Amino acid sequence: MIELKNVSKVFTTKKGNVEALKSTSLQVKKGEVFGIIGYSGAGKSTLIRCVNLLEKPTTGNIIVNEQDLTTLSTKELAKARQKIGMIFQGFNLLKTVTVYENIALPLRLAGVPKLEIEKRVEKYLRIVDLFNRKDAYPSELSGGQKQRVAIARALSHEPEVLLSDEATSALDPETTDSILDLLLKINEEIGITILLITHEMNVIQRICDRVAVMEHGAVVESGTVKDIFTNPQHVTTKKFVNSAFAAKIPAEVQKELQRTGEIVTLSFIGNSSGEPALAVATKRFQVYPNILSGNITQLKHEAYGKLVIHMQGEQNEINHALSFLQEQGIIVEGGRTDYGKQVLFG
């Protein structure tokens, strides 16, 4: 559906050339929600703007719907862009016209027949649950409602791809969740492919199927959201994963606790998150776990949790208990054994 092949982007400034993208390649499958996450300056905004050629790449190929956009004429590119919708952090609504007209006007400019315009505007305003505000002006809407209008406008052209450029970063947490739920609903009901960029791990974990992590203009790690959460490799990825869990154990506390036992991080995914495996382990083996911190969250359609424990007991008993937990589908990290390299909350 979307493929970037060795895409680079160099901006020329008074101080010299700035390489915003460095030979970046990635693939987005048809019908999935693909997230790109990175800190400010990572290159994610440049990347997503290259997908519809709002930014023309310096080198590389952009393939969308089996068309290499970098080879198209101006007329051909304009036609191809009709199948690529985009929403932004700023809503870009026309302040002097109604919600209805904000959606209808671009369709008129595109030459869509009047009856078809009426049909589409009603259809997509109902999808975003704003049909009852069709005669309102943008100044009368909340931030979340404005973004819903922007989403309806993008969908009214009936694209196959929807690009989201930090669409929720200006919204409060509750409104962000409602917009994410709406995007997930659109993906599941309409089947549209969504490519989004964000600096918030909450966005990735709530609606994405796969994710790419960017740093300094390059993709440093990518995979399914489940794999990224349960087995992050790059240091930047680990920071993002840890940001989803508020707990942090001070180094001094860790050092003191490690004198009397092992600090272990247990990760639960899917069905294992609801099983009393730790309780069973304490009955089966002579180990005494003390819970230091814990959290459970949702990765799109399955639960994911982390539990940091201080486990006391004879080393042999601890080893057997941790092996038992792994057999129950729990990911075990930390401690003095080879169950993991480090405690993620350290």
From Swiss-Prot:
GO cellular component, one term: plasma membrane
Subcellular compartments: Cell membrane
Domain ABC transporter residue range list: 2-241
InterPro entries named in the record: AAA+_ATPase, ABC_transporter-like_ATP-bd, ABC_transporter-like_CS, ACT-like_dom_sf, MetN_ABC, MetN_ABC_transporter-like, NIL_domain, P-loop_NTPase
Principal location listed in the UniProt entry: membrane
Annotated positions binding ATP: 38-45
Reaction(s) catalysed (UniProt annotation): L-methionine(out) + ATP + H2O = L-methionine(in) + ADP + phosphate + H(+); D-methionine(out) + ATP + H2O = D-methionine(in) + ADP + phosphate + H(+)
Keyword RNA-binding among UniProt keywords: no
Membrane among keywords: yes
GO molecular function, one term: ABC-type D-methionine transporter activity
Alphabetical keyword list: Amino-acid transport, ATP-binding, Cell membrane, Membrane, Nucleotide-binding, Translocase, Transport
Entry superkingdom: Bacteria
Membrane-topology descriptor: Peripheral membrane protein
Catalytic activity, EC: 7.4.2.11
Biological role stated in the UniProt entry: Part of the ABC transporter complex MetNIQ involved in methionine import. Responsible for energy coupling to the transport system.
Family: Belongs to the ABC transporter superfamily. Methionine importer (TC 3.A.1.24) family.
Subunit structure, interactors included: The complex is composed of two ATP-binding proteins (MetN), two transmembrane proteins (MetI) and a solute-binding protein (MetQ).
Name of the featured protein: Methionine import ATP-binding protein MetN 1
Record organism: Bacillus anthracis
Organism ancestry: Bacteria, Bacillati, Bacillota, Bacilli, Bacillales
